[in-house]
Every structure is written in structure tokens, then in C-alpha cells.
Amino acid sequence: MSQEKKVFKTEWANRPLSIETGQMAKQANGAVLVRYGDTVVLSTATASKEPRDGDFFPLMVNYEEKMYAAGKIPGGFKKREGRPADEATLTARLIDRPIRPLFPKGYRHDVQIINMVLSADPDCSPEMAAMIGSSMALSVSDIPFQGPIAGVNVGYIDGEYVINPTVEQKEVSRLDLEVAGHRDAVNMVEAGASEITEKEMLDAIFFGHEEIKRLVDFQQEIIDYLQPEKTEFIPKERNAEVEEKVTALTEEKGLKDAIQTFDKKEREENIDAIRDEVVAEFEDEENPDNDEVIAEVNSILNDLVKEEVRRQIADEKVRPDGRKPDEIRPLDSEVGLLPRAHGSGLFTRGQTQALSVLTLGAMSEYQLIDGLGTEEEKRFMHHYNFPNFSVGETGPVRAPGRREIGHGALGERALRYIIPDTKDFPYTVRIVSEVLESNGSSSQASICGSTLALMDAGVPIKAPVAGIAMGLVTRDDNYTILTDIQGMEDALGDMDFKVAGTEKGITAIQMDIKIDGLTREIIEEALEQARVGRLTILNHMLETIDQPRPELSAYAPKVETMTIKPEKIRDVIGPGGKKINEIIDETGVKLDIEQDGTIFIGAVDQDMINRAREIIEDITREAEVGQVYNAKVRRIEKYGTFVELFPGKDALLHISQIANQRINKVEDVLKLGDTIEVKVTEIDDKGRVNASHRALLNKED
């Protein structure tokens, strides 16, 4: 990498973009500083000197949000950054996906890409800057990489597509799309949307790709100028004799028939049996290099299984479980399984099963997101768990990993649009999807299960959502698109394209591929095939429960709203929160007050809510001129008495207004605690109230 500082500039969505090399992190294999508006990201790429054993490419992408980038000090006792937030993990996955397919086949060196956000401008996406930075750090390094790539954010506002919309524009956009790729094709898509059509989504993807081409050309100019020297990578050649023998043995032992079975475990056992028999033919304890031979045999076997699965799909149009390319596995749904949960749904598709459980909470139970942008209160959460038993395995039980965080977020994106607004449904909603069985498409099963749970809970959703995962097998110049892929098709195919939506349109998509990229024709066909599959699944779900239940669970908290004048908020809260805490302690409710004066009152019992409402009404109640009140004597002075019209509001009853005749002392007529009927006669500009008992006596006369 060049050690002399160079700066390259262009425009990106009408904002300045510059890439700097040669000044920072010079001991990394490659490093660039990306400046986009006021956003600054340092991206580095480093590779190990020696390859790792195994048949997996060890790529690690990190995205680090430094709180100083937004002028903030981290919360918590330690006051420093800790484990990455979910949003940072999702961004790291977003960058990983378009980059991973572009390393040479067989490359096994550890590669780590670290993106440090040093300055964050909310209107100049640090995430997209980090994606370009990752591509450039690899491109200017000596690491073999078949890039560059670029990514953009696409919005859809008033029928117009917008590149990298601002925070303000995102609030009114019907689409939040991240698309990435190289000059010739798209290779990553991630989106949340409000029921947009397949055509609108397709146009958005390729609108974004036009900008990607320009950004790739900009990067290529930098690469051509710097002329980085790349480490030559020569894939290890296989032993032709061993490969020929393994191929003959697997064919002889019936690999084709071993693959063709509906049951996942039976298929795995069939393939393992052939593997054991073939490996036994090569075992030689006296050969010191026998372990290497066995490893090569297993690698060849894996490739033969992959090739046979792909051949059957591409040539015979038959899938491992016997389905046609556009056929969905058997479906089964159930709701109301858990009596004490607020809502539950069990969704089964073939050998994939998800149990989604919903909990309703008060508005105060929202999740506070304190990242580099403004604080966000999230009142809808979807969490995804993938226990070991779901695939028949054992292992340690750990905190959610990147995959679980990613699948949970995808489900959240798919369902967020259908969650009713606060004014219509003043609750915090949390759904947990437990994957009980997995043979592919578990994230989409969790979306279907969550829709069932929402309707079972009585949440007035805008429309039910279903999700489906599409696959792809390319062979020579032909391709086959698969509906509802299972685990083997995901692992051995070329694409995992998840599409979720309602009857009217798409609410979320996510696309990962293992080939260089996809053409418009393939994506268009996949979207249409997904639409047909999605409608089939929706129809099945509606046979189980066709609309949200009319009432919430008896065990769900009750939440009611009331509105007060904003200037009365301080009266309800009281000095240092004294008054609101008194209300909570007395009634046992949860209170949430918005700046516009909306108050959410939550409790398990209606009487508790009613009592809290009464107290708040008394506090915020205003005296009216001409209104008559039964007032209580609170304080006596020489010039009159202060009476309480209602809790929190006193009035002055002047000594001259107590009786028709002249009195010398208030105590001659009234004492503390007495009740007297008074009429409000005046409220001055400072809110002070004057009252009269005499006016009522005159009226009686």
C-alpha cells in the first residue's frame, strides 16, 4: 500500500465524498479514510500470513460505533464502549455479505475488516461510507479481492426514488433499501417497506445499481492510480487419482438415491453412510500423510454432493425432497397454545417450525436506542432464538449471535409496518420467536408465526404478513429459481432471497448470494415467484385465524389514554417527580406522559386505572367563572379564608364575601375543615381565583 497521503474526491447524492490513503493505519494490509459530508470512517483490511485448516473462508467484518463520533459519552458505570450494539452488528453483516463472494475460491487466510466511525453525520450514512471503505481497504491492499463493490441506500418518496435519503426524508419514505454490488450486477439487497409492489422494488434495486456503477468506477480510478501489488493466490490442486476414485465410489454406492428423500435426518444419514464407506477405502494407518488424504477425500465428497444436488435441480427439475421448483412444503398452523401468554402462534413448514410468543407492555417498557443518532424509543421488538436442539445438536447455550440478531431484525422489519400506531394501540409489543425445528427458512417461519401471535393477541394489525425464502441454482447458461428452500438448498445453492409481505405488497426483503451477482431478469422472476408463494402461505394462515381477536388476553395489561393541556404536565409530575410517584404508589399503575399532554395509564385492573384517572383529572381540573363548588376551608387569614375548590385548586373567599352582614372575624362563621358552597367570581391573569358565598345567598333571597 502506498505510504504517501493521497486524497481522491467526488460527489455522492449531492454531498462531498473523499477517500484518503497513505496516512493512517499503515501497518494494516490496506487502510482508507472515508469522508462523506461530516461523516468520517476509518476502514482497514488485514490478512493472516498463513491459511487456516478447514473448508471455510474465515472472514470477519467489524463495524465499531465510537460514541465520541456523535459527541456523546457512553452510558453505564464504565463509561466506555462495550459489546457492539445490535445496530452495529447488523451493519457488519450488511458489509460482509456483498464482499464475501468476491474472494478467490479456496482462499483460507483469515481476513479481518474493521470500520471505525470517527465522526457521524446522520444525513451522510456512516454505514454506506463503511461499505465503500471496506471495499477500498481490500482493493488497495495486497489481499486477493475481485472487487471493488459499493452500496447505497434508496428511499421512495412521492413516487420518486432517492439515493441516500436524509433523516427527515426517511421519515416519509415508503422504502428503506440497502443495495450493493459491483459494476456488472447486484449481489446484496436488504429492505424494509410499506407494502410496495414487486415492480417498485425491482426498479428501486436497479435505480440504486446505477449509482453503484458510478461509485465503482470512482474506486477503480483510485486503484488504477495506486497500482497496488496483489499477493498471488494459487489454489491447492487435488490429487487427480484420489478424485477419480472417490467419484467412482460415490456413484457406485448410490449418491443420487441417497440424496432423494423427504426427511432431512434420513438424507444426512444416507450421505454419512456413503462417506464412511468411501473414507474407509483410503484409511492407511502406516501412511504419515493419511490425515491429509482423508481431509481431501471429505472435501471431494462435499463437492460431489453439491454437484449432484445442483445437477438434479438444474437438469431434472427435482429437489432433494422430491418437490418441484415452485412447490412449498406442507404447512401447519396453530394459535392460542400458551394460556398465560398474551398471544402465541406455532407455524410449521415441512421440517421447519417456529413458536412465536407475544407480550404486551406499557408504553414505558419501550427499548431506548442510544446510538450515534438521536435517541430512539422502540415500542415494537422481535427477537429470534435458534437453540441447538432445533437441528438435533448439542452445545453451549450462549447469548444471541450475529445470525440470531440478524434474523430477529429481519422479522422486525417485515412486521413493523403492520403494527398499529400509538394512538390506536398504546402498548409496547415484544415477540420472541423460538425456532423448535430447522431445515431452512426459519427466519421466514418466525415471521409467519409472529403474525399468528399478533392476531391471537388481538393486536389490530393493518394486514397479515407471511415470509418465504427463494433459492437459485445456476448451471452453464441456465438457472432454476426455487420456492421455499430447505437447508441443503440454501447451503449448496447460489442464493438465499427472503421476501416478506402482505397480500398487497412487500414489507421486507433480504438477499444473499454466493455468485458474482444477479441480473434484473433473475431478480424479477424471483420476486414474482415469491409473490405467488407468499399468497399461498397467507391463505393457509387465514384458515387458522382470519382476523385479530376482538379482545386482548385477560392476562394482558390494560392501557388507556387521556389528554391534558401541556402546561398541566408539570402539575401531574410535581417537583422532582413527587406527585407522579404518589399517584403510582397509591394506584399501582404505570404512567407515561408525552410532551403533547397525552397520558398512557397502564394496569392489570380497571379499578386501578379509574382511580389514577380521577386523581389526574383533579390535579389538572380548572376552575370556571360562574361555577359553584362545595369548598373546604384550608387556611384562615384576617382578610378572609382560602378554600379548596377541588384537590390542587384553592380560591380566596374574602371576608366581605362570606355573609350578607358585616362580620369582624372569619372564625365567627367558619373554622378549618368546614365545607361551604362558593361561586367563582373571578380568575385573574396569574390564575388566582376569587370566590363568593355571599353571591349565592343573594341569589337565594
Swiss-Prot record:
EC number of this enzyme: 2.7.7.8
Chief location bin: cytoplasm
Top-rank taxon, per record: Bacteria
One Gene Ontology cellular component: cytosol
Enzyme class: transferase
Cofactor(s) demanded: Mg(2+)
GO terms, molecular function: 3'-5'-RNA exonuclease activity; magnesium ion binding; polyribonucleotide nucleotidyltransferase activity; RNA binding
GO BP terms, alphabetized: mRNA catabolic process; RNA processing
InterPro entries assigned: ExoRNase_PH_dom1, ExoRNase_PH_dom2, ExoRNase_PH_dom2_sf, KH_dom, KH_dom_type_1, KH_dom_type_1_sf, NA-bd_OB-fold, PNPase
Record-stated family: Belongs to the polyribonucleotide nucleotidyltransferase family.
Known role: Involved in mRNA degradation. Catalyzes the phosphorolysis of single-stranded polyribonucleotides processively in the 3'- to 5'-direction.
Name of the featured protein: Polyribonucleotide nucleotidyltransferase
Organism, as annotated: Staphylococcus carnosus (strain TM300)
